[in-house]
Amino acid sequence: MLYSIRGLTMAHFAKIENDTVTQVIVVSNDDCGGGNFPDSEPIGQTFIASLGLTGEWLQTSYNANFRANYASIGYTYDADLDEFVPPPIIEPIDEP
């Protein structure tokens, strides 16, 4: 998803390590070819690599328009579903 801040259209990319999101960055739409997902993703990935940032970077949607959820640190990426999955909610244990 692309969104606008002060007239700048931005895209978000998540760094994936061992299927886990470890970082999320914002990239200018101009650096993603000016288009929409999925066309913008490989162009954005090339731009991210040109900055010297290594690893696997996947575009994520702030409004969850694709890949099911906005990627946040600690989420997992399910490649089979092509979705970002939130971590499980751990309920506190009531002690007697």
What is the predicted function of each stretch?
Residues 1-96:
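Viral virion structural and adsorption modules
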